[in-house]
Amino acid sequence: MMNLKQLAGEYAAGFVRDGMTIGLGTGSTVYWTIQKLGHRVQEGLSIQAVPTSKETEVLAKQLSIPLISLNEIDILDLTIDGADEINNDLQLIKGGGGALLREKIVATSSKELIIIADESKLVSHLGTFPLPIEIISFSWKQTEKRIQSLGCETHLRMKDSRPFITDNGNLIIDCIFPNKILNPNDTHTELKMITGVVETGLFINMKSKAIIGTKNGIKEY
């Protein structure tokens, strides 16, 4: 069976041109973009990249992709990243890999955001996939209760029987909204007003395009 993630990831690498400074997302689909870019760098492509996670940083270094800090530049030409859900308005849920804060910082520092995914990530309404929320660890139970007051079911993300810790030293609360997320803008705003919430996995109002791997080939949105 065709690997639809690989199809989308490698296709998106074609948007990267010589001399660009780009953002590299995190996850199983972007993995294929980074692999493709590594091959192109070996063939002479000259780029600089900002990784959105330690995982991506390690992979990029293994492939000899030159890395820089976001502090060294004003704006990125392009960021390529994956998504856990994509609705008809190209609003996203991201953060399944736990890198949502750095992913959002990099995405909002880019002229253009290309989202890559397989067709299973397309939805009419966001919210079937749990919405990740990054929170500080201090008094996290109080923050969780305030999040629950918005009508969602919450779970502290775990890894190896311990709380999952982000690259920023924070925790992740995964939230299920029983009636889906019908107004992502309002939900994002309400969550960000809760003290202790650092960032949400809702990526909205961004200049983006989506590259979707389907059984019939690539579709662009």
Swiss-Prot record:
Enzyme class (EC, first level): isomerase
Function: Catalyzes the reversible conversion of ribose-5-phosphate to ribulose 5-phosphate.
One GO CC annotation: cytosol
Catalytic activity: aldehydo-D-ribose 5-phosphate = D-ribulose 5-phosphate
Database matches in InterPro entries: NagB/RpiA_transferase-like, Ribose5P_isomerase_typA_subgr, Ribose5P_isomerase_type_A
Assigned protein family: Belongs to the ribose 5-phosphate isomerase family.
Pathway(s) it belongs to: Carbohydrate degradation; pentose phosphate pathway; D-ribose 5-phosphate from D-ribulose 5-phosphate (non-oxidative stage): step 1/1
GO molecular function terms noted in the UniProt entry: ribose-5-phosphate isomerase activity
Provenance organism: Bacillus mycoides (strain KBAB4)
Biological-process GO terms, alphabetical: D-ribose metabolic process; pentose-phosphate shunt, non-oxidative branch
EC number per UniProt: 5.3.1.6
The protein's name in its UniProt record: Ribose-5-phosphate isomerase A
